Amino acid sequence: RDRSVSRGLGDVYKRQIEGKPDDLVINTHVCRGNYHSTYAFEGGYDPIAPYLFANEDVDAFYLEFDTPRAGGFEPLRYVAPGKKVVLGLVTTKAAELEDEDAIVERIHEAAKYVPLENLYLSPQCGFASCEIGNKLTEDEQWAKIALVKRIAERVWK
């Protein structure tokens, strides 16, 4: 049943972008909720990966991997060749900065499934995905962005 629902939604999505201009970039973000520094859902990408990552007609997937509740990188093995994967490894839900070396290590772990040249780094979601936003100050948000920049410069020299 879950597979038929996924396929049905995928078919609706495909019809929505049929005939899009060649230069229109389509990306998708798989969100688990981001309301005032809390989340709504947990669990890995395993149940949806075989269909979503292999079949969704997008240029890139923006995926949350900021906590263990997101599961491992193994489902990335289903990502179709040439697709980009943006790894949301830096949380927008807490002010504490992630360890740079640990993030670099996780990027290389993800590269076992998707070539490094097709991987990107970002915060796991927006800093204010809804009107109330998250419990981070503006300075804390800029520190997270600076962290992403530093790590990206290390990994993709």
Protein language model annotation of sequence segments:
Residues 40-44:
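Ligand-binding pockets and gating/stacking loops
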